A protein has these predicted regions:
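N-terminal secretory signal peptides and thylakoid transit peptides that target proteins
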Residues: 1-18
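Solvent-exposed loop/turn segments at secondary-structure junctions
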Residues: 65-67, 101-106, 166, 171-176
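A charged helix-plus-loop insertion that forms the helical arch/lid used to bind
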Residues: 111-142
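A cross-taxonomic marker for long C-terminal extensions/tails that follow the last structured domain
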Residues: 130-186
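Loop/turn elements at helix/coil->beta-strand transitions in domains of secreted/extracellular proteins
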Residues: 55, 91-95, 161-165
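C-terminal segment of N-terminal export signals and the immediately downstream linker at the start
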Residues: 25-55
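Histidine-anchored nucleotide/phosphate-binding helix
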Residues: 70-87
Length: 186
């Protein structure tokens, strides 16, 4: 009798497993509906991004004085790397460097730096590495600093000549303008 019970249990377990296998295996696997490709929101303020030439698009975000310098270095590196790695021309590579937060001041020209360099130097905690004083020019426009700055001599002008475009933070620009106005008594 004991052998009969074990035999029936074994038979029932086997039939249960076989039934489950048939039920699961006989169903045709259906793939999920593919997700729609990502489509970013479009705003008229961003239309200029559609006009940026080049099929290999890169966006570099810089938010600090060091980051601004590194942005110039990285932009140059993208042109060099895409030329050597993919045989791409500079016109095939689209680079946008965004200067925001404390990197925004490096979007300002030498006239602004000459007049407000001391104030900006204090706000940014950034000094000329040669003089240890507040800069009176935009140091990212000079190739004379070499390894002393994170751009390693790659200037704003040199990456612009290669095709780099810049996005500059509106909020940070207004912040700097307000700080300069307050310091000037306005």
């Amino acid at each position: 009798m004991q052998d009969n019970i074990l035999g029936r249990r074994s038979l029932m377990s086997g039939l249960g497993a076989a039934t489950a296998a048939l039920a699961l295996g006989s169903k045709t696997a259906s793939a999920q509906t593919p997700a729609r490709p990502f489509q970013p929101a479009r705003h008229s303020q961003d239309a200029w991004l559609n006009a940026v030439p080049g099929t290999h698009r890169n966006f570099i975000d810089a938010s600090t004085p060091n980051g601004a310098g590194e942005g110039m270095l990285y932009a140059n590196n993208l042109y060099v790397a895409n030329k050597s790695g993919y045989s791409l021309n500079e016109s095939d590579v689209a680079v946008v460097v965004c200067l925001r937060h404390f990197a925004t001041a490096f979007a300002f020209n030498d006239t602004i730096w000459a007049k407000y360099g001391k104030l900006m130097s204090t706000m940014l905690q950034f000094t000329d590495p040669k003089t240890k004083e507040a800069p009176s020019t935009n140091l990212l426009n000079s190739a004379d600093y070499g390894m002393a700055l994170p751009n390693l001599g790659n200037t704003i002008e040199s990456v612009v000549k290669r095709g780099t475009q810049f996005a500059v933070c509106d909020m940070a620009t207004h912040f700097f303008a307000a700080q300069i106005a307050m310091a000037a008594g306005g």
